[in-house]
Amino acid sequence: MNELTLIDFYLCFLAFLLFLVLIMLIIFWFSLELQDIEEPCNKV
């Protein structure tokens, strides 16, 4: 039982890390998109 709970905790931790990485990638991509949109406006 203890091994199963440890494995479940490990899987939940990995899923949480993957979720954080996905959020960071989305925020990073969104910030790049905003910069691409702002650059032409600043040039004009």
Swiss-Prot record:
Q: Does the keyword Ribonucleoprotein apply?
A: no
The membrane topology of this protein is:
Single-pass membrane protein
What superkingdom does the record give? Viruses
Give the stretches traversing the membrane: 9-29
Where does the UniProt annotation locate this protein? Host membrane
Q: Give yes or no: UniProt keyword Membrane.
A: yes
Q: What else is known?
A: Bat coronavirus 279/2005 is highly similar to SARS-CoV (SARS-like).
- GO cellular component term, pick one: membrane
| Protein name in the entry | Non-structural protein 7b
Query: Which species does this protein come from?
Result: Bat coronavirus 279/2005
Mind listing the UniProt keywords for this protein, alphabetically?
Answer: Host membrane, Membrane, Transmembrane, Transmembrane helix
Where primarily located? host cell
